[in-house]
Amino acid sequence: MVTINQLVRHPRSMKVAKSNVPALEGCPQKRGVCTRVYTTTPKKPNSALRKVCRVRLTNGFEVTSYIGGEGHNLQEHSVILIRGGRVKDLPGVRYHTLRGTLDCSGVKDRKKGRSKYGVKKQKV
């Protein structure tokens, strides 16, 4: 049991919450340049070729970012925006690429959930 004198000398310290997305440094998004665009396979029991890219951010961090949606136009030296959000079946992938901003195009022929994939509303 701690005495009051001990608490006066050294107060209780708060636990510091560890960020899930340290490379963003508290920002909602960060800009970066693709250094490598490739596919990788998920953990068991899933099976696919997930599209990911290695990104060098403006703050010097180098992170792996997932490219969502069907098809993309990214290649080396593309400038993209990333947001937080991990991919559960890809170890080490803690960021998502934002579609429809900077050099990353929106998903072609997307009709539903368009805002998540950078697609404008179609004219009737």
From Swiss-Prot:
InterPro entries in the cross-refs: NA-bd_OB-fold, Ribosomal_uS12, Ribosomal_uS12_bac
Family (UniProt): Belongs to the universal ribosomal protein uS12 family.
Gene3D superfamilies documented for this protein: Nucleic acid-binding proteins
Record's function text: With S4 and S5 plays an important role in translational accuracy. Interacts with and stabilizes bases of the 16S rRNA that are involved in tRNA selection in the A site and with the mRNA backbone. Located at the interface of the 30S and 50S subunits, it traverses the body of the 30S subunit contacting proteins on the other side and probably holding the rRNA structure together. The combined cluster of proteins S8, S12 and S17 appears to hold together the shoulder and platform of the 30S subunit.
NCBIfam families: rpsL_bact (TIGR00981)
Subunit structure: Part of the 30S ribosomal subunit. Contacts proteins S8 and S17. May interact with IF1 in the 30S initiation complex.
Pfam families reported for this sequence: Ribosom_S12_S23
Source superkingdom: Bacteria
One GO molecular-function entry: structural constituent of ribosome
Residue positions, PTM 3-methylthioaspartic acid: 89
Organism this protein belongs to: Baumannia cicadellinicola subsp. Homalodisca coagulata
HAMAP family, alphabetized: Ribosomal_uS12_B
Protein name: Small ribosomal subunit protein uS12
Gene Ontology BP annotations: translation
Keywords attached to this entry: Methylation, Ribonucleoprotein, Ribosomal protein, RNA-binding, rRNA-binding, tRNA-binding
Disulfide bonds, paired cysteine numbers: none
GO cellular-component term (any): small ribosomal subunit
